Amino acid sequence: KGFPALKLALSEALASQPESPSVPIHNQIRGDDPLRLAGEKLIKENTAAMYATLNVNSEEKLHECVAMLRSARRIILTGIGASGLVAQNFAWKLMKIGFNAAAVRDMHALLATVQASSPDDLLLAISYTGVRRELNLAADEMLRVGGKVLAITGFTPNALQQRASHCLYTCLLYT
């Protein structure tokens, strides 16, 4: 018997298994969806989330946040995980249009950067939950040095909102 028999038994077992049921991958997207359908579902979900985000933030609030960005000497953007990637992407876009912006995703470097900030600087912290201790410590430190904090976070009340000078809310739609 030995190894060849084991390989044969495994291949027979795999061949005799019924097709596995479709499993959910993300919201309405299922593992057996054709690629085009998965793409269409993803576009629909993202569009709905963007409209919900637009509707939850007033025009006045958007203008106030734009004014904060324009008046900042330096914009320090941060986030953890996927929010850090959003911060990095937004920093690049701000730099392209002439803002002094930098994304700091390493939390030790973030605290050092914020401690060396001035009252004219702005911390733009991105966190859907707003509960990450590192981001809230950075926000506290920015306020201590006299700077401002702009949070992009979820609508549910959280610690980051309490520290922020201004908040923009984002909506994630899960079903």
Residue ranges and their predicted role:
Residues 75, 123, 149, 167-168:
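Short, well-ordered beta-strand core segments
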Residues 157-169:
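Glycine-rich, charge-decorated loop segments at or immediately adjacent to ligand/cofactor-binding or catalytic sites
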Residues 56-60, 103-109, 149-151:
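Short gly/ser/thr-rich secondary-structure transition/capping motifs
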Residues 144-148:
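A short helix->loop->beta-strand "cap" motif at the edges of active sites that frequently abuts
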Residues 2-60:
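HTH-adjacent hinge/linker in prokaryotic transcriptional regulators
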Residues 67-133:
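Glycine-rich, small/polar surface segments that engage phosphate groups of diverse ligands
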Residues 139-143:
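Surface-exposed amphipathic alpha-helices with a cationic face
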Residues 174-175:
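Conserved small/polar residues in nucleotide/adenosyl-binding loops
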